[in-house]
Amino acid sequence: MLANVTRSTSKAAPALASIAQTAQKRFLSVHEYCSMNLLHEYNVNAPKGIVAKTPEEAYQAAKKLNTEDLVIKAQVLAGGRGKGHFDSGLQGGVKLCYTPEQVKDYASKMLGHKLITKQTGAAGRDCNAVYVVERQYAAREYYFAILLDRATRGPVLVASSEGGVEIEEVAKTNPDAILTVPFSIKTGLTREVALDTAKKMGFTEKCVPQAADTFMKLYKIFIEKDATMVEINPMAENNRGEVVCMDAKFGFDDNASYKPKGIFALRDTTQEDPREVAGHAKWNLNYVGMEGNIGCLVNGAGLAMATMDIIKLNGGVPANFLDVGGSATAKQVKEAFKIISSDKAVSAILVNIFGGIMRCDIVAEGVIQAVKELGLDIPLVVRLQGTKVEEARELIKNSNLSLYAIDDLDKAAKKVVQLANVVGLAKENGIKIKIEN
């Protein structure tokens, strides 16, 4: 196993950095204070902190910590908090403080306001909590993560002597500084591998055993809590010669949500796209919002991705990924349209269904219901193939609705891009138009 502890190549580093991003996006993420509480639960050395949801609570938390060295951190599920800004005018979501009064003042400018970072986009995200934490001084900073890696089909340690910065930046500028250690989930993380990794990361001799112990505890969390990612950035040696996890990010497997472990009770849906929450929780629809103007309703994740690709190839930009699955009802299809049309940027919609398990006539019924009941006034291109397709075409024909029924996918994509461009141009100029087939 020790032979597997190798320096990452320039190709592997960006790939593993990408894993970290994907894990956070695909699976449940929890706030920093929840992650830190979990570290304390497993006796991992981490700074003391208290969560607060009002300025007064923040003030009391600062007094309780009883130190003049404090940090207040906005609890928003997005990276780049320190370099972000609030709609209140406050610059930065991580602030050093020296008095409880200063903590209270910063809390009043964070709580109830939106934090805008590179990851949130211009819309920002609501800050409903702050984490007041004791400040610790790092003599050395490292990066450490445990991820699930599809390439090796198991867990992998990703570590670096360059902590406290974005791992993606390290991967770009100095990929040789990243250490990757795949290991078997059957044998788990052994102490031998943990010690060797700590040495290769550059921990001082005194701190190597502490670091290895920390790695083992983090792996225990990873396994027992069904994590897909455990990321510590930075992991530090403080000025007292102790290994401390200064910040933590966890991702958890959505497929484990049925287990009574309490992790999924920590989900903060205010930090998620409400359309994604509604689609998944209420209607079992796999929806991901994007920034384009062409809505997509497709069955099957692969076909959905191919549909987005062909829209892009024809010069359009998808507004969403939406997979209705193989057993959707007409009601679910209608609700899918409701979610898509709630995005004011959508100028046209492409329905692309290949009926295997999914019947085309069911989709057609849902399309007709949606257009009639929701009063959809944007162009709709429908491409249906497969089971019950003739019945579906007959339903659409008899509905007397103004739909574009096109069998060829490339032609359907071209048409929806053309229509979206026309409607988009009209919107920009304040002109209301109605396109009829």
UniProtKB/Swiss-Prot annotation:
UniProt keywords (A-Z) are: ATP-binding, Hydrogenosome, Ligase, Magnesium, Metal-binding, Nucleotide-binding, Transit peptide, Tricarboxylic acid cycle
- Designated gene of the protein: SCSB
Annotated substrate binding lies at 299, 356-358
Relate the protein's function as given in its record: Succinyl-CoA synthetase functions in the citric acid cycle (TCA), coupling the hydrolysis of succinyl-CoA to the synthesis of ATP and thus represents the only step of substrate-level phosphorylation in the TCA. The beta subunit provides nucleotide specificity of the enzyme and binds the substrate succinate, while the binding sites for coenzyme A and phosphate are found in the alpha subunit.
| EC number in record | 6.2.1.5
| Principal location class | other
> Which terms in the GO cellular component ontology are assigned?
hydrogenosome; mitochondrion; succinate-CoA ligase complex
Q: Give the reaction(s) catalysed.
A: succinate + ATP + CoA = succinyl-CoA + ADP + phosphate
Instruction: Tell where it localizes.
Output: Hydrogenosome
**Residues annotated to bind ATP:** 73, 80-82, 141
Query: What's the protein name?
Result: Succinate--CoA ligase [ADP-forming] subunit beta, hydrogenosomal
Q: Which cofactors go with this protein?
A: Mg(2+)
User: What is the top EC class of this enzyme, as a single word?
Assistant: ligase
Which pathway does the UniProt entry assign to this protein? Carbohydrate metabolism; tricarboxylic acid cycle; succinate from succinyl-CoA (ligase route): step 1/1
User: ATP-grasp domain: from which residue to which, for each copy?
Assistant: 36-278
InterPro entries per UniProt: ATP-grasp_succ-CoA_synth-type, ATP_grasp_subdomain_1, Succ-CoA_synthase_bsu_CS, SUCC_ACL_C, Succ_CoA_ligase-like_bsu, Succinyl-CoA_synth-like
Locate the residues binding Mg(2+).
233, 247
State the family it belongs to. Belongs to the succinate/malate CoA ligase beta subunit family.
